[in-house]
């Protein structure tokens, strides 16, 4: 208060004022850092909302649909994993007539009249070559029973399958019994959908969890930094004393090391001087003995 009355402030007062000014500057810097971290947090929150909008717009799941069962087709040439279009074309070419031609009767009648005899003839030849003629009638009767239980080919369903192959996406094709009988399941699309590559955009729930983790880490780092800085400002004198004691201990250690080095150097020099005087004494003794 002396400078308010017109007198010059003392040195201690000037040092105190300078110290408080430094503290105020550090506090302002800490406030600016915290404000910058808050800005980063708000920006990340806005980006999170934007990612949520992208997820809902482009990575939405299709509406739940029922599985469409395609009739089993005894094609014999379609293997699991082949293209659906090729499969439908193959089935259509095998069962339906070529353009401009018509079968007489239904597919079932053509099967009974045309393909059945050829198949039975080939079956008899293969059976006779492999197993002989015995028990052929028993095997033939068993084959008849299995043939009655197997489903017939439906030409209308084949037409429907071939016409709608561009709107269907096969998701499962499993074999039952042998490779000649295939079950094909497909999903009918309910609307246009656009899917991003897998792993490029994560779901909203996972993205929120990751941003929450980032927020927690940033908040903890800012809290620890601010706490340490405020503690340093409050306990400045104590910290300075600790640092001064460290420096004093280091100076004492260096001084003691220097003194020890000087003592060793002095002792070595004394030994050298003592050794240099010995030849002079011997020379004097020889002179005295000869005289």
Curated annotation (Swiss-Prot):
GO cellular component: membrane
UniProt signal peptide: none
Function: Involved in osmoadaptation.
GO biological process: cellular response to osmotic stress
Keywords: Membrane, Stress response, Transmembrane, Transmembrane helix
Membrane topology, record value: Single-pass membrane protein
Protein name: Uncharacterized protein AN2204
Subcellular localization(s) per the UniProt record: Membrane
Induction: Down-regulated when grown with elevated levels of potassium chloride.
Transmembrane segments: 213-233
